[in-house]
């Protein structure tokens, strides 16, 4: 399966002056090389996400093998048909720092919507019961997502990952005290609404992610993405908010560590 050796040595601490936190990404079998390349450009901390039971177990194993890498465990809406059985036990792992990614995807509808809603509801309940953060994936389902959060109680630390909304959706997230994570999508020419949301998002509610290997930012769009590329999105956010890269990196890292 995964040929991972315990890498407790600090990987090349040449790293850049600016230190970034990728929250989240999807690490796999080539995690060691990807993490080394990330460290070389100052991406020193990462959360790797689970999307079903098997991938959550892989995420936990990777987090166990590398310093400053943590995992989430959850059932993505695409996998909702399989239910949440076995998830609760994975959340007991010391490497797991959040429930997710969980949510609703009415764009692809890979699972029936009623099953998506039930599985999302169960994961909100788990996050609340275990006092854990919740990482949300929502696509073409903003109203339904907010309705379920309101019905079940939005967990204290809730993150809307890979945010694709605009200022209106941002306000709905912030009104529920949630944080918002921006990916390489923000660099796409078509993402003017996302950039408008970045401009309005309070720095203390802003997180950064690659969602790698997906969504490589401009100028790398279309390539396989990895955590090292977070600097492109970070620079864009610094430009939009008239901040330095260091200020964005420090704030988003502190936000991720809360």
Where are the model-predicted features located?
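Mid-domain alpha/beta scaffold segments of enzyme catalytic cores
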Residues: 3-258
């Amino acid at each position: 399966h995964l040929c991972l050796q315990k890498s407790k040595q600090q990987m090349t601490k040449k790293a850049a002056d600016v230190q970034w936190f990728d929250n989240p990404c999807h690490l796999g079998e080539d995690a060691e090389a990807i993490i080394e390349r990330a460290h070389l450009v100052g991406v020193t901390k990462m959360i790797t996400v689970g999307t079903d039971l098997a991938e959550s177990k892989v995420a936990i194993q990777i987090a166990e093998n590398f310093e400053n890498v943590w995992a989430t465990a959850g059932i993505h809406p695409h996998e909702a048909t399989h239910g949440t059985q076995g998830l609760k036990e994975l959340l007991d792992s010391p490497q797991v720092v959040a429930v997710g990614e969980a949510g609703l995807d009415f764009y692809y509808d890979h699972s029936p919507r009623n099953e998506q809603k039930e599985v999302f509801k169960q994961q909100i309940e788990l996050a609340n019961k275990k006092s854990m953060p919740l990482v949300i994936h929502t696509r073409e389902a903003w109203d339904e997502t907010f309705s379920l959060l309101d019905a079940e109680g939005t967990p204290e630390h809730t993150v809307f990952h890979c945010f694709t909304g605009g200022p209106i959706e941002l306000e709905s997230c912030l009104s529920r005290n949630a944080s918002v994570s921006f990916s390489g999508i923000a660099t796409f020419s078509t993402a003017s609404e996302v950039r408008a949301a970045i401009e309005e998002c309070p720095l203390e509610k802003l997180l950064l992610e690659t969602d790698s290997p997906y969504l490589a930012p401009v100028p790398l769009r279309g390539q396989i993405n990895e955590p090292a590329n977070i600097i492109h999105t970070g620079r864009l956010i610094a430009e939009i908010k008239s901040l330095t890269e260091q200020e964005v990196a420090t704030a988003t890292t502190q936000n991720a560590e809360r």
